């Protein structure tokens, strides 16, 4: 895992606003958390724990790595991966807006 992703995970766990390079974590007044990559909203974590993910149309290794670091922060054993140029999450085909209800 990249250093920036470890720092991002710490910000998410500690519920603090943080920014470094192309990645930003911010929180709203209702306890929701948001992660952006290059200004694109790639993850929303609700105050109830639901996780909504998006590549924002950028299915790159960096986007996938950030999404997996976010998933690793809150869940065990689930990840975004690529097979034959198609992204998957668990057994499902990944799509922008994919939501994990917890």
For the regions a protein language model found, what residue spans apply to each?
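Terminal leader/tail segments of proteins
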Residues: 1-102
């Amino acid at each position: 895992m990249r250093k920036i992703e470890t720092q991002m995970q710490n910000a998410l766990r500690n519920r603090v606003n943080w920014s470094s390079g192309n990645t930003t974590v911010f929180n709203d007044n209702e306890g929701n958390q948001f992660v952006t990559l290059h200004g694109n909203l790639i993850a929303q974590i609700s105050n109830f724990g639901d996780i909504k993910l998006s590549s924002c149309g950028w299915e790159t290794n960096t986007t996938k790595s950030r999404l997996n670091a976010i998933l690793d922060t809150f869940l065990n054993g689930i990840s975004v991966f690529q097979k034959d140029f198609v992204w998957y999450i668990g057994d499902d085909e990944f799509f922008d807006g994919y939501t994990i209800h917890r």
